[in-house]
UniProtKB/Swiss-Prot annotation:
It is found in: Cytoplasm. This is SsrA-binding protein. One of its GO terms (cellular component) is cytosol. The lineage of its organism: Bacteria, Pseudomonadati, Pseudomonadota, Betaproteobacteria, Burkholderiales. HAMAP family: SmpB (MF_00023). Its main location: cytoplasm. It comes from Bordetella avium (strain 197N). Disulfide bonds: none annotated. The gene is smpB. GO terms for molecular function: RNA binding. The keyword Cytoplasm applies. Keywords: Cytoplasm, RNA-binding.
Length: 153
């Protein structure tokens, strides 16, 4: 079950490979995520010292958060992956044009997981081509549906 999707990711990037990782979260963050108070829109994954980190994910603290903890909504969160996967990703990210893009947050066995992808940035004309193709597919489906109805009558 998906908690939140980053719909902008498929618009801005060509998605190559998908990966799933665990997140190192604090207790108040888990409660806020379960309440749906999270945004992935401007977030991205970086490589630092041979580890992967998620930056820019905004988790709004609940008003009932503890008074002795000062929540930081935009803190850097570590991603949990096997060492072999991390080394493979580091090799691919160092290639020109590749980046790691968060796709969605979801639950797996009661734990919060992050789906992210190895993506290549789209240029403006690529975005236009994708949009044009989607419009054409939508129009084709509409015409075929209309034509099918006419034949059955």
């Amino acid at each position: 079950m998906s908690i939140i999707d980053n719909r902008k990711a498929s618009h801005d990037y060509f998605i190559e490979d998908r990966y799933e990782a665990g997140l190192v979260l604090q207790g108040w963050e888990v409660k806020s995520i379960r309440a749906g108070r999270v945004q992935l829109k401007e977030s991205y994954v970086i490589v630092r010292d041979g580890e992967l980190f998620l930056l820019g994910m905004h988790v709004s603290p609940l008003p009932t958060a503890s008074t002795h903890i000062h929540p930081d909504a935009m803190r850097t969160r570590k991603l949990l992956l096997k060492a072999e996967e991390i080394h493979k990703l580091i090799g691919k990210v160092e290639q020109r044009g590749f980046t790691l893009v968060p796709l969605n947050l979801h639950y797996k066995n009661g734990r919060v997981k992050l789906d992210f992808a190895l993506g290549r940035g789209k240029k403006l004309y690529d975005k236009r081509d994708t949009s044009r193709e989607k419009d054409w597919l939508r129009e084709r489906e509409r015409v075929m549906k209309h034509d099918t109805r006419r034949r059955s009558d």
